[in-house]
From Swiss-Prot:
This enzyme is involved in nucleotide metabolism: it produces dUMP, the immediate precursor of thymidine nucleotides and it decreases the intracellular concentration of dUTP so that uracil cannot be incorporated into DNA. Pathway: Pyrimidine metabolism; dUMP biosynthesis; dUMP from dCTP (dUTP route): step 2/2. This is Deoxyuridine 5'-triphosphate nucleotidohydrolase. Its cofactor is Mg(2+). GO terms for biological process: dUMP biosynthetic process; dUTP catabolic process. SUPFAM superfamilies: dUTPase-like. Belongs to the dUTPase family. The keyword Hydrolase applies. It comes from Thermoanaerobacter pseudethanolicus (strain ATCC 33223 / 39E) (Clostridium thermohydrosulfuricum). Pfam families: dUTPase (PF00692).
Length: 148
């Protein structure tokens, strides 16, 4: 399935590349940091990092914003609300809530690949209140019910 994803760069991001897939089988396209100056993220610090893009998704689609595994593993940099959800009717700039969970300060430079965006189709079910739910073998077994 193929859809059209319209992407508009903000006025201060015209020099940055559009989001791009880095391999043939990549599920997510990389997003770039649209910072005017290098940002220093201290251990435990949270900052809002703009991407310089706005998107237009078709109805019944969403964009999930996810961390990049290399930044998480090597530097402890991740997104605080992951995955972040971009709804199809949102037209503002995509911004990232970035946190440094590492032990060292990390620099975020303009144009650095900072997160990835995955496009998903969504289903909006009809909600029906129920008094009884069907039983299953698992039933109400929750956290750790299959062992550790």
């Amino acid at each position: 399935m193929s859809i059209i994803l319209k992407i508009k760069k903000t006025d201060d991001a015209k020099d940055l590349p559009l989001p791009a897939y880095m391999s043939e089988g990549a599920a997510g396209m990389d997003l770039y940091a649209n910072v005017k100056e290098e940002v220093i993220l201290q251990p435990g610090e949270i900052k809002l990092i703009p991407t310089g893009i706005q998107i237009e998704l078709p109805p019944n689609f969403e964009a999930q914003i996810r961390p990049r595994s290399g930044l998480a593993l090597n530097y402890g940099i991740t997104l605080l609300n992951t995955p972040g959800t971009i709804d199809s009717d949102y037209r503002g700039e995509i911004k990232l809530i970035v946190i440094n969970l590492g032990k060292e300060a990390v620099k975020i430079a303009r144009g650095q690949r900072i997160a990835q965006m995955v496009i998903n189709q969504i289903v909006r079910p009809t909600i029906v209140e129920a008094e009884i739910l069907s039983e299953t073998k698992r039933d109400e077994g929750g956290f750790g019910h299959t062992g550790i």
